[in-house]
């Protein structure tokens, strides 16, 4: 998946953990002070769902690395446009992109 997202040359650290207490299926947290991205996944028995969630979160890592997605104190900036904290989840363009890529990234990863 990292190759498909063109992240193989990134100098950032990627840390992936499983946390049964996380509310959502996955979350990506940029730790900008230490050039690290933390991906937290909820462990589920459905490995296909877990793989798709990982692909979704790695898409967010790619968005952060490329600078198209940035976190601010009042929301997020996507390709230069600001989106406040109250922007509905499915109206956030970075989420739309991640959902559109997650299945194909996961399917390509398991073909190898």
Regions found by a protein language model. Give the residues of each.
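Zn2+-dependent metallopeptidase catalytic core
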Residues: 1-10
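Juxtacatalytic substrate-recognition/specificity segment
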Residues: 14, 18-21, 31-39
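Short, solvent-exposed loop/turn segments at secondary-structure junctions
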Residues: 19-23, 44-46, 68-69
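Short pre-active-site segment immediately N-terminal to the catalytic Zn-binding motif
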Residues: 37-54
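Post-HEXXH active-site segment of zinc metalloproteases
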Residues: 48, 64-96
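Active-site recognition of the HExxH zinc-binding catalytic motif
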Residues: 52-64, 98
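Long, well-structured alpha-helical subdomains associated
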Residues: 88-91, 97-112
